[in-house]
Amino acid sequence: MLNNDTFYPTPVPLIDRMIAKIKGRPQTVLDPAAGMAAIIERMRDYSTMDSDNRYCYRPYENCSYSAIEIDTNLQAILDKKPFVSLIDTDFLQYSGRDHFDLIIANPPFDRGDLHLLKAIDIMHRGEIVYLLNAETIRNPYTHSRKELAQRLAERNAEIEFVPDAFKDAERQTDVEVA
């Protein structure tokens, strides 16, 4: 495990729940808090049945995957993965010059509101699937959380609260996520 206080690798069952939220067929995907690319790897390997339940297929294996990661140790890990392109090092400073069909992430819980606001700002057309500390949604006591609550309401965002999501994770915590 890396020595990083904000790095909580996303458990596979939680990644699967996130993937199940995807409604479209993205071709370009960004994980702006990529860590070791667990979400991207799971998306590439994710398989599902066709609508007639006759055969299994992998709908996201040919997507173009981009990542942003601030931790230099994690950047070194990402650099060794040929299926992901590390395009920047700090999502909150990222210019948004690229266009993506999907932004999917588990950002640091202490900056989740700022990360999701940035994702909303740079998403021109497509979907956003984000994992946040539930308190970020339930307790909008800061300016950025209030702005996030307003912008989510304007977009009729679908929010699901998941208790004990990190109970059996590589790095455990009892935080509820949304």
Name the predicted role of every residue range.
Residues 1-178:
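Class I S-adenosyl-L-methionine-dependent methyltransferase catalytic core
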